């Protein structure tokens, strides 16, 4: 949303260099943030799963980790195209993402169970569909932006990268925090429920995970 708003303002004023600077600064910022978060999530999956009192989820967390990187870049590219009033790339990328999530995740989850693997590996297989969907969606937008590169000449002097990053944070952080509220509540809820099922009722981790899954349904 922050990228879309900033790009829209520059687009309305005809500031082509400003638009390019916003995108180039944002893409590198989100590239770094996404890469760090994905690496931490992948290699610290066990710690995150233990925090949720569900060590069985570690494999699924690792399967989801690359998607974090892809989503960061997707947000930047979608914001850039939307800010120019072009919703088609976003719409196509979202359709691709949804189709692959279902088309890869569901068959893979079924296949893993069919060959006799554990439920947690089947869950990880389903999550692979999410990662594949976001990755293909990201590649589609990359190809679109390369083939539709902004080559318009302009004499405007763009803002510095530092100013753009500051503006992204000022706009984006409050929005991100408000949108993350429900996700944070769900994480805390999962931790509490799994902990009470195991420590309060004395259930095994597997039994607690099954009951927690039924509770979520």
Walk through the language-model features, giving the residues of each.
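Helix-terminus/linker motif at the lipid-water interface of multi-pass membrane proteins
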Residues: 49-50, 117, 176, 180-217
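Short membrane-interface helical motifs at transmembrane helix boundaries
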Residues: 36-56, 114
């Amino acid at each position: 949303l922050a990228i879309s708003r900033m790009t829209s303002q520059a687009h309305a004023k005809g500031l082509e260099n400003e638009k390019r600077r916003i995108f180039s600064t944002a893409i590198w910022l989100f590239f770094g943030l996404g890469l760090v978060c994905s690496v931490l999530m992948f290699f610290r999956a066990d710690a995150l799963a233990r925090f949720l009192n569900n060590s069985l989820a570690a494999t699924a967390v690792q399967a989801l980790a690359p998607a974090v990187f892809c989503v960061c870049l997707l947000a930047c590219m979608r914001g850039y195209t939307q800010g120019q009033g072009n919703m088609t790339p976003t719409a196509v990328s979202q359709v691709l993402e949804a189709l692959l999530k279902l088309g890869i995740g569901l068959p893979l989850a079924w296949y893993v169970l069919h060959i006799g693997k554990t439920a947690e590996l089947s869950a990880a297989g389903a999550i692979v569909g999410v990662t594949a969907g976001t990755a293909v969606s990201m590649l589609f937008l990359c190809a679109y932006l390369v083939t539709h590169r902004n080559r318009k000449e302009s004499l405007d002097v763009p803002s510095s990268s530092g100013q753009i990053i500051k503006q992204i944070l000022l706009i984006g952080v409050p929005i991100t925090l408000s949108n993350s509220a429900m996700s944070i509540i769900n994480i805390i809820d999962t931790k509490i429920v799994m902990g009470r099922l195991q420590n309060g009722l004395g259930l095994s981790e597997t039994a607690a995970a099954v009951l927690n899954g039924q509770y979520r349904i």
